[in-house]
Each structure stands twice: as structure tokens, then as C-alpha cells.
């Protein structure tokens, strides 16, 4: 019986040693900060919308006689799918999207997308981006958050327009190509 009592006594002494710090132990405190982000489900950009080629058309350089002259607009669409719908527990009032267009700004009018440089490139104009209400969106600017009109599958179309806009009175003919990137933020 004494042997069993001794085992429990040793256990109790060890437990007390670790559970109740001695006054001689260091009083250093350690702070551990955890950070992270919890994302709600967002929409997926469809494969066909990721790498688009928009045909801007062929125009006579003489159609751009004054600074600010524009060509007819060409529409392009960014299709998104699988967005959370109003029935979802993630969003109760639908989904809003903000599209940010990035690219090289024109040297004369920084709101326009600069044409790609080359020996046979047109000069004196850039590409203007418009929303579906014909409101200009500056390159490296944002469309602003707008509610997406989702179908029952959570799919939506974001429609924008592009057009040439002259930055000089003397527009020189040539290739008028450019590269535009976009990112979409959801809320």
C-alpha cells in the first residue's frame, strides 16, 4: 500500500511543479498573431472571355481631323458564371462587380489605352473604353461596382465598348492594335 501511495505522491509533486509556476521562472509573454482571409464564393470568368480579340474595324485616317474625334464603338463582353445567387447564403442581395482595366496609357491622353508601338503602327490616337451606358472608363481605372444581372445558374454578362479616339490633329495611318488586361472584384 505504501508503494502505491508513493507513486501518487510523486505524480502529484510533478503535476504541481508544472501546473503552478515557481516565482523563480521567467515571466516572458509570447504573443502569436494569426492572420488570414475568408473569401466568399466569387464568379468564374468563362474561358472564351479570358483571351478575346476585338475587331475594331478599318477606318480612314482622314476621319480623325480634330482632337477627340472617335470611331464607331465595338462591343465586347466579359462572361462570368457560377456566381452566388440571391438564394445563396453567401450573398443575400445579389452580386456586384467592379472591372479594373489595365494597360499602357497613351502619352498624350492618359485616359486612353496606348496603341502598340511598331514601325507600321498608327499614331495620333488611342483606344477609349466605355461602359454599356457609353460612360468613359480611364485605362488603369475602374468601372465602379455595379449589380450583376444573374440568370438562374448564376451567370452574367458584363458589356463594354471600345473605340479609337484621336489625340492629335494629324493621325497617321497604320496598324492600330493594343493589349488590354482586366481584373474583376466582387462584393
Predicted regions and their residues:
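Mature extracellular/passenger domains of Gram-negative fimbrial/pilin and adhesin proteins
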Residues: 2-8, 23-187
Amino acid at each position: 500500500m505504501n508503494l502505491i501511495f508513493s507513486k501518487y505522491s510523486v505524480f502529484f509533486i510533478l503535476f504541481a511543479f508544472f501546473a503552478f509556476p515557481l516565482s523563480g521562472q521567467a515571466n516572458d509573454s509570447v504573443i502569436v498573431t494569426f492572420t488570414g482571409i475568408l473569401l466568399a464564393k466569387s464568379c468564374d470568368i468563362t474561358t472564351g472571355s479570358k483571351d478575346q480579340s476585338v475587331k475594331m474595324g478599318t477606318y480612314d485616317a482622314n476621319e480623325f481631323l480634330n482632337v477627340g474625334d472617335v470611331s464607331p464603338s465595338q462591343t465586347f463582353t466579359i462572361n462570368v458564371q457560377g456566381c452566388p445567387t440571391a438564394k445563396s447564403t453567401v450573398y443575400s442581395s445579389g452580386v456586384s462587380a467592379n472591372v479594373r482595366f489595365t494597360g499602357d496609357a497613351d502619352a498624350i491622353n492618359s485616359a486612353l489605352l496606348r496603341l502598340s508601338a511598331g514601325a507600321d503602327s498608327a499614331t495620333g490616337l488611342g483606344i477609349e473604353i466605355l461602359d454599356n451606358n457609353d460612360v468613359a472608363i480611364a485605362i488603369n481605372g475602374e468601372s465602379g461596382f455595379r449589380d450583376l444581372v444573374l440568370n438562374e445558374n448564376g451567370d452574367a454578362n458584363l458589356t463594354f465598348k471600345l473605340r479609337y479616339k484621336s489625340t492629335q490633329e494629324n493621325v497617321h495611318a497604320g496598324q492600330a492594335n493594343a493589349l488590354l488586361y482586366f481584373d474583376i472584384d466582387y462584393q
